Amino acid sequence: MQHSQVSPNARQQLAETVVLNKARLGLSWQDLADGTGLALTFVTAALLGQHALPEAAARKVAAQLGLDDDAVLLLQSIPLRGSIPGGIPSDPTIYRFYEMLQVYGSTLKALVHEQFGDGIISAINFKLDIKKVEDPEGGSRAVITLDGKYLPTKPF
């Protein structure tokens, strides 16, 4: 049976332990995701407290990280989602995503509604991918794919 968290504190504390053990053991997020049958981005988000992991995946990553049975249960619990308390993020990387939505949010909304109609793009039935590609002008570029199911508004 799945259980739900009533506070983000336990998952935040576990996320801090995950990051510390990951560093101590020299593991990458990909190392932790490998063999779970789940996407790198999903496993990373789960280990940072944003998703529940299936039992087999929770046991696998807990074993890699040296976590106990309580951590395995916690990794399977449904978290209180949302990792940006207090509104505007101060971390520069997260802020850039906030800034992108400040600049392009109304454009995305207009194009979604024009192409799909009145509704939303789900963040539950959702896939996220990130790839590093070479920039022809030098350096690297990040290609981020947000793939969410369109859910139309239904009058009632």
From Swiss-Prot:
Catalysed reactions listed for this entry: cyanate + hydrogencarbonate + 3 H(+) = NH4(+) + 2 CO2
Keywords from the UniProt entry: Lyase
Key word Lyase present: yes
Coiled-coil annotated spans: none
Keyword Ion transport attached: no
Residues at the catalytic site: 96, 99, 122
InterPro entries: Cyanase, Cyanate_lyase_C, Cyanate_lyase_C_sf, CYNS_N, Lambda_DNA-bd_dom_sf
GO molecular function: cyanate hydratase activity; DNA binding
EC primary class: lyase
Domain of life the protein comes from: Bacteria
HAMAP family reported for this sequence: Cyanate_hydrat
Similarity-based family: Belongs to the cyanase family.
Primary role: Catalyzes the reaction of cyanate with bicarbonate to produce ammonia and carbon dioxide.
Protein name: Cyanate hydratase
Organism: Pseudomonas aeruginosa (strain ATCC 15692 / DSM 22644 / CIP 104116 / JCM 14847 / LMG 12228 / 1C / PRS 101 / PAO1)
